[in-house]
Amino acid sequence: MKKLLLIAATSATMLSSTLSFADGMDNEWYLRIGAGAAMFNKEKDEATSVKLKSNMTVSVDLGIGYYFSKNFRTDLTLGTIIGGKLKKSGTATNVPFSGTNVSVSYKPTITRLLINGYVDLTNFNIFDVFAGAGVGPALVKEKITYNGITGLASTTKNRTNISYKLTLGTSAQIADDVKVELAYSWINDGKAKSKNVVYQGQKVQIGGMRYQSHNLTASIRFDI
């Protein structure tokens, strides 16, 4: 947690310094609220070798941003996911679980703080098309359950990773000082912590799942 606060403070300082540089420009701040759907990439449980699939989860974020020019803006966003899960039932092939029918579930908790930059690629009368990228710290932990194998269920501690985000979207003005946007984003939040447990006298590594997601988000921006 201390590491996340340190990185957050550094991010805020960088954003503040950049805004001070642009103080002489006639630009505006904005608030951004977004929500949408997300799906994680398919991954494999290392303990059993069962390949896991993602459910459809909800992503939300809240941010404050600044227009540096007509075609460039940046914002600082705090985001998380709600109800995300990687799960699958199958037959384990790894020792000591070989031949065991098991249902595996990974439920992550992810909180990320990102500095994002966006550039308008086109400017039409009705809408704009933009591309963007973001980077910042992410706290990642997971709850792991194994139905069919006793003694493996576990919850890992938070791990601080560097999260990366790539975005392509479109925006339109619907009222004075109000814009809506629809965007696709790919986000890499890194790996959760792994841990060793003893099962029938053997050490078994569980956890350590990598979380990469595809996101479709609808947002609204209020100029302030």
UniProtKB/Swiss-Prot annotation:
Keyword Signal: yes
Signal peptide: 1-22
GO cellular component: cell outer membrane
Keyword set, alphabetical order: Signal
Disulfide bond positions: none
Pfam families xref list: OmpA_membrane
Entry-linked InterPro entries: OMP/PagP_b-brl, OmpA-like_TM_dom
Annotated protein name in UniProt: Putative adhesin A1E_05320
Organism whose genome encodes this protein: Rickettsia canadensis (strain McKiel)
Lineage: Bacteria, Pseudomonadati, Pseudomonadota, Alphaproteobacteria, Rickettsiales
